[in-house]
């Protein structure tokens, strides 16, 4: 069956967007607020009509992720911030496979996300309450699956409990995108053997943003 590279590229951009937001939060203590909202909201919507609907129905909501994906696909550098982004992205993919292999963890994740949806009726998505709840899901359900993702950044920034919660909530969004990526036919071999196809598709989507 032919792969739908539009959906695959969107989901992959979702993973990359989370990786870029985590990097920005860890080094600078801040990140693009619209991209963060899109990524965090994707965790809540468990019954989307389409892949694009997971990310708010707008390709522009994944602009940072698409740019990050293109940078990763087209760089030969294995050093510095680029290598960091690649490590975060691949680590999220590995954790998703661990999650998929654990029926108990998947069930727990589903229940905890349902609880999140109920909390969203009373709190804003970016509120400390929701951030802490999302971070708690990552710590309780995803981290024990291992291997843990080592986040690099400014020690002063990473000491902040609020930043720690945002980073973990954003990693949870990355897991959500990685689950979606597998669901629409994504796989790590594509990063080696379908780079040109992914690059072309990402450029086409970016042109619409």
Curated annotation (Swiss-Prot):
Its main location: cytoplasm. Gene3D superfamilies: HflD-like. It comes from Cronobacter sakazakii (strain ATCC BAA-894) (Enterobacter sakazakii). PANTHER family: HIGH FREQUENCY LYSOGENIZATION PROTEIN HFLD. It holds the Pfam family DUF489. It is a peripheral membrane protein. Keywords: Cell inner membrane, Cell membrane, Coiled coil, Cytoplasm, Membrane. It is found in: Cytoplasm; Cell inner membrane. Residues 95-132 form a coiled coil. Belongs to the HflD family. The keyword Membrane applies. This is High frequency lysogenization protein HflD homolog.
């Amino acid at each position: 069956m032919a792969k739908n590279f539009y959906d695959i590229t969107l989901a992959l951009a979702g993973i990359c967007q989370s990786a870029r937001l985590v990097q920005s939060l860890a080094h600078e203590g801040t990140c693009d607020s619209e991209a963060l909202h899109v990524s965090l909201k994707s965790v809540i919507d468990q019954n989307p009509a389409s892949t694009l609907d997971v990310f708010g129905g707008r390709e522009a909501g994944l602009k940072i992720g698409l740019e990050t994906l293109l940078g990763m696909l087209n760089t030969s550098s294995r050093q510095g911030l680029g290598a960091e982004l690649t490590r975060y992205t691949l680590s999220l993919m590995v954790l998703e496979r661990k999650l998929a292999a654990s029926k108990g963890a998947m069930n727990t994740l589903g229940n905890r996300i349902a609880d999140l949806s109920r909390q969203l009726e009373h709190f804003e998505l970016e509120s400390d309450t929701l951030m802490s709840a999302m971070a708690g899901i990552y710590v309780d359900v995803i981290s024990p699956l291992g291997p843990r993702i080592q986040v690099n950044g400014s020690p002063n920034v990473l000491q902040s409990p609020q930043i720690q919660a945002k980073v973990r909530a954003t990693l949870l969004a990355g897991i959500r995108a990685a689950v979606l990526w597998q669901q629409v036919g994504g796989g790590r071999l594509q990063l080696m053997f379908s780079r040109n196809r992914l690059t072309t598709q990402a450029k086409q989507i970016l042109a619409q943003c």
